[in-house]
Amino acid sequence: MYILLTLLTKSTMESSCDNFEGLEHYYYTDAEPSSKCNKFQASGGSGVVMAESHIMSSEAPPKSNPGLNIRTNCRMILNLLREKDCSVTFSPEQPLTPVTDLAVGFSNLSTFSGETPKRCLDLSNLGDETAPLPTESPDRMSSGKLESPKTQFVQFGGLFTPDLAWKAKKCPKRNMNSVLPHLLCSTPSFKKASGGQRSLSNKENEGELFKNPNCKPVALLLPQEVVDSQLSPTPENKVDISLEEDCEMNILGSPISADPPCLDGAHDDIKMQNLDGFADFFSVDEEEMENPPGAVGNLSCSMAILLSGPLLNQDVEISNVNNISLNRSRLYRSPSMPEKLDRPMLKRPVRPLDSETPVRVKRRRSTSSPLQPEEENCQPQRRGTSLKKTLSLCDVDISTVLDEDCGHRQLIGDFSKVYALPTVTGRHQDLRYITGETLAALMHGDFNSLVEKFFIIDCRYPYEYDGGHIKSAFNLHRQEEVTDYFLQQPLTPLMVQKRLIIIFHCEFSSERGPKMCRFLREEDRASNDYPSLYYPELYLLKGGYKDFFPEYKELCEPQSYCPMHHQDFREDLLKFRTKCKTSVGDRKRREQVARLMKL
């Protein structure tokens, strides 16, 4: 063969060496294959004989260009030798283009002899339904005859080489249904309608489906039929997709669905082959598939019954309240238990009938217990004096306390009698006020049956007193004067049944009169043992001389009114205020000295 090639090349090189640049390009024409060349057979040395016979039987080129005929023959021989080295065979049915030639050549490689190769699993494209997939050659699609319902895919060398005989010995048929409970929440399990009907002539592709693990993760729970529909361009599979969508809508009614059982042995083979290499880790006998254990096989069924079953009605009889047990309620009782409610009506258990204690008597008298009538009937009558609940401060109404306080306030300073004159409320809550009308009635002798003698103390400054005052009133504006007049020689009534009362007032009875009244009470308390007092009944004229003068001028002398801040008595006001403050300071110092001497 090499000798022939050398002779042809040498003769061609002598004629025209510059025309061999086109040897690298070779194209088939649209003429019939029998008129151009015979098929080159890739077997031993028969290729040379076929090439020689082809050269001898080819048509003679035109005589005008003998060098072109030699170059054409050399190109044909070189291309046939190149095709022999690549071991490429051509289809005898029709001429093939270079792209179709490449596809058919790879499909006829010896690596894929005896089975239909499938593409490897690409996990990144599972969610993309429109991803382009490699399909078979166009000449087989145009023929309209498919040996297998599954589409054949071109797989390039080195990616996947199945070995069914080795896997059949190493991995026997197993079933994963009894190992892992198929609780596909929100993901129904599909079963193809035409999965059990397979062509008998498709024996070489039987059991050669794409192998993927049956136990998919949550993110990869895709139906097997959807994947098959993506790999098949035939219209029959498109019809199956619509049927599968209807099946999906029917199955999505329940949140938990079990994987449907296999109907034939071929489907079991498909499931076991989908396990790929994971069957060694999750292998279970086929007998366990038919008779699954109770703990695992009934898991999905029991959960489905629990979620989809009707609600249990718990009958509660209100009339049988007395028959309910008096035990503490269970906090964590299951709401699905069919038993009746035996909850207690009382917080505390019933004491034995023979325990006669005061605690039991108190509980028997409680109105919150529904068992009160029965306990009263069963309780024997106690003889003698019964224990009574003492009155505590918590049980006393606050209004009662206030009423009692008001009752105590109606008593005079030594708590021996009530006030002889009607009193009213005023600015100072600790002092007793009388109105001008009451003072006028007192001066007219309306209270002579109760009052033996009364004193009206005018606490205003002397210029105010000289400008107008109440008849028979004493002007005592200094504390020393009050102490000397009432405490140096205390006054006592001649009759024990009658009273000796003192009435204080100033211009408004808001500052000077209340201060003098409190001072006398404090000095009187200090001079006597509590609660004894020389002058237990003290009053304040409400509104002072200002309110009394307009209404009762006849009881005032002179019948005039001189205010404290009169323009003509400013100097007198400053002088009397200074004396009052000095006297107050001296009094405080004397009190402190007296206290130190007592210590």
Curated annotation (Swiss-Prot):
Broad EC category: hydrolase
Keyword Cell division: yes
Active-site residues per Swiss-Prot or TrEMBL entry: 506
PROSITE patterns associated with the record: RHODANESE_3
Keywords linked to the UniProt accession: Cell cycle, Cell division, Hydrolase, Mitosis, Protein phosphatase
Stretch list, region Disordered: 125-146, 334-384
Reactions the enzyme catalyzes: O-phospho-L-tyrosyl-[protein] + H2O = L-tyrosyl-[protein] + phosphate
Rhodanese domain mapped to chain residues: 450-557
GO molecular function, one term: protein tyrosine phosphatase activity
GO terms (BP aspect): cell division; G2/M transition of mitotic cell cycle; positive regulation of G2/M transition of mitotic cell cycle; positive regulation of G2/MI transition of meiotic cell cycle
EC identifiers of the protein: 3.1.3.48
InterPro entries: MPI_Phosphatase, Rhodanese-like_dom, Rhodanese-like_dom_sf
GO CC terms in record: cytoplasm; nucleus
Domain of life: Eukaryota
Pfam families named among the record's database cross-references: M-inducer_phosp, Rhodanese
Residue stretches of biased makeup (Basic and acidic residues): 339-359
Family membership: Belongs to the MPI phosphatase family.
Purpose of the protein: This protein functions as a dosage-dependent inducer in mitotic control. It is a tyrosine protein phosphatase required for progression of the cell cycle. It may directly dephosphorylate p34(cdc2) and activate the p34(cdc2) kinase activity.
Protein name listed in UniProt: M-phase inducer phosphatase 2
Organism: Xenopus laevis
Gene: cdc25-2
